A protein has these predicted regions:
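A short, Lys/Arg-rich alpha-helix, primarily the initiator
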Residues: 1-17
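Helix-turn-helix DNA-binding elements, focusing on the entry/boundary residues of the two helices
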Residues: 18, 29, 44-47
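Key DNA-contact positions within bacterial/archaeal DNA-binding proteins
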Residues: 19, 30-33, 59
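Recognition helix of helix-turn-helix/homeodomain-like DNA-binding domains
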Residues: 27-42
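Short C-terminal boundary/hinge segments that cap the last helix of small helical domains
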Residues: 55-62
Length: 62
């Protein structure tokens, strides 16, 4: 399972909305959607922002 798939599964499993996570992470909705669909690379800075928004460690997804 790829990192973005783990992030997406975590969001879904915890009943969160992707748009809410994107807003909290400071990532544009379209960019976040592209990352979660594997159409854009999930860079370390984006992963860090997402993890801060989710209040989890990046190691959870690696």
């Amino acid at each position: 399972m790829r990192v973005y798939e783990k992030v997406r599964a975590y969001i879904d499993d915890n009943g969160l909305k992707q748009v809410a996570v994107a807003q909290k992470a400071g990532i544009p909705k379209a960019t976040f959607n592209a990352i979660m669909n594997g159409k854009r690379t999930l860079y370390a800075d984006d992963l860090r922002a997402i993890c801060l928004a989710l209040n989890v460690s990046p190691e959870l997804f690696i």
